[in-house]
């Protein structure tokens, strides 16, 4: 039987921040899951063991894991054989169905947001400060893709991780002077792995891809999602009235999601209401 994998990082996070991710995923999917956690995340470790989840412990800090996770993921995949892999964020995602029960069009699949790069100050900043104005101008009309959800075959995911790792090493985020002088991470650059992902995809450095629209695709990245519709089961629907497979960044639209998320939490056995 061919196996699939969900792989994510959750260094320094609390159990309650991840309960919705874990329980909603395990409601629909019983195959392999791997979490990267910190060495001091003891309560989280217990919860992951209870849910039969692989654990990788790291000394890397919560602030640095955003970049370093790709190397850890790549190392984990050595000598492993999976059919498809979902690499995703953890804290701000919940699932509405099995992420692998869908006929994805690409060997590797990326999921768009609802804004152009030039219209988002965060994505604009990440690309300018890693690749420069000239490269930014070449892709600034492209729609943002979210690096927090990537689905593909093992070989393409490995290729993608390798490209990300190489570009993180080659194109350093230009920190503000006060952070450079004190050898600290610039907080504005912590999400710029997404800048690398957008550069790699929109410059066509990886082939056999498919880009799914946010409104009609299988994954919802809701920060810039234009229309929010729920059915009577509290499921978020796309423009075809199909439930999204997963919902990402729901906390950024919390007023619109609170009642539905709390109903979902009750249904999957989470007592604590937010």
Question: What spans do the regions from the language model cover?
Answer:
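A structural signal for short, well-ordered beta-strand segments and their strand-loop junctions
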Residues: 34-36, 85-89, 94-95, 109-111, ...
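Catalytic core and acceptor-binding pocket of nucleotide-sugar-dependent glycosyltransferases
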Residues: 139-258
């Amino acid at each position: 039987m061919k196996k699939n994998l969900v792989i994510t990082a959750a260094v320094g996070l609390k159990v309650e921040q991840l309960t919705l991710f874990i329980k909603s995923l395990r409601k629909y999917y019983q195959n392999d899951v791997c979490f990267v956690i910190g060495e001091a995340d003891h309560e989280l470790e217990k919860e992951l063991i209870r849910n039969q989840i692989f654990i990788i412990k790291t000394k890397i800090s919560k602030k640095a894991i955003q970049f370093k996770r790709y190397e850890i993921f790549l190392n984990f995949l050595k000598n492993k054989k999976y059919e498809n892999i979902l690499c995703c964020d953890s804290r701000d995602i919940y699932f509405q169905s099995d992420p692998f029960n869908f006929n994805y069009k690409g060997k590797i699949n990326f999921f768009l947001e609802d804004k152009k790069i030039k219209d988002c100050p965060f994505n604009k900043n990440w690309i300018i400060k890693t690749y420069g104005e000239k490269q930014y101008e070449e892709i600034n009309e492209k729609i943002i893709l979210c690096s927090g959800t990537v689905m593909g075959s093992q070989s393409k995911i490995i290729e993608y991780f390798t490209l990300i790792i190489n570009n993180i090493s080659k194109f350093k985020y230009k920190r503000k002077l006060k952070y450079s002088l004190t050898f600290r991470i610039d907080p504005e650059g912590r999400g710029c792995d997404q800048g690398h992902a957008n550069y790699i995809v929109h410059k066509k450095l990886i082939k056999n891809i498919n880009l799914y629209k946010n409104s009609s695709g299988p994954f919802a990245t809701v920060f810039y999602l234009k229309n929010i519709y729920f059915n009577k089961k509290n499921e978020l629907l796309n423009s075809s009235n199909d439930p999204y497979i997963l919902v990402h960044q729901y906390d950024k639209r919390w007023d619109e999601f609170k009642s539905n998320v709390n109903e979902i939490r009750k249904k999957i056995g989470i007592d604590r209401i937010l």
